[in-house]
Amino acid sequence: MKDLTVIVPIQNYDTETQTLLKRAIDSYKKADDGKTKLLFIGPKEVIEKVKEEYKGKNTSYIENENTNFQTQINIAVEKCGEYFSILEYDDVYTPKWFENVEKYMETNNEASIYLPLTQVLLYEGMENGPIGYVNEAVWATSFSNDLGYLDLEVLTSYMNFNTTGGVFRTDDFKKVGKLKESMKLTFWYEFLMRTLFNGKKIFVIPKVGYIHTLNRKGSLSYIYNETLSNEEADFWIETAKKEYMFKNDRNKTFEA
């Protein structure tokens, strides 16, 4: 896809990561039409190893010692073209995802974010295939005010949306304030609400474009689902609802 950069944030390069990353990059190659760029960001010692394995004229690297996901993305977008997408190393694209985005953009070019229908896998039992979908709710009759679009009213009461794999307009991502580092666990939820609050549009393309892995130990979903109490989870949700009206990260240290 022209003017699209795929960001791959990575924190380590152990045997498990190498196996999962190869799977992720293979999916990128199948989806790529030769125009998409690939950008790895991670600590210096990790990037040095990645460089040995993944090379090419459309591949670049950023060495950054801060392994905070939000920081990595915020730094990487400064090196992106008109659009960017995020590929987590334990996830995969479907082969026609970028092609489908381009087709929908031909008739619907007003959205700031194009999300895919996302299949969900459990890390333990990946071989069993998807257990369900996310992002599909906006295509249900009467769910949102405009079929296929996410709206703020719905998002404040329903938060089961996955953003990785989506295609973002880089300038709009910057204009609404990027990701907030202080939002430790619900940063994507807060970002989606902030995007809509600032008058931008989020559209879900009714095509499966991404397969997302849940509950890999150490992942955000694992932390959220397996280690947080109900009170802590509620705290982060409510904090997101209070912070989305502020464009800039207010640099608070939130504690549940």
Where are these regions (language model features)?
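Short, acidic, metal-binding catalytic loop of nucleotide-sugar glycosyltransferases
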Residues: 23-35
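Glycine-rich, basic loop-to-helix element that forms the pyrophosphate-binding segment
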Residues: 64-80
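Short beta-strand-to-loop acidic/aromatic patch adjacent to the donor-nucleotide binding site
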Residues: 82-92
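Conserved donor NDP-sugar-binding/catalytic core segment of glycosyltransferases
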Residues: 96-134
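Catalytic beta-strand/loop signature of glycosyltransferases that borders the donor
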Residues: 117, 203-209
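Short, flexible, basic/aromatic active-site loop/helix in glycosyltransferases
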Residues: 117, 134-158
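Acidic donor-binding loop at a coil-to-helix junction in glycosyltransferase catalytic cores
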Residues: 184-191
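Catalytic core of nucleotide-sugar-dependent glycosyltransferases
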Residues: 208, 212-214, 221-252
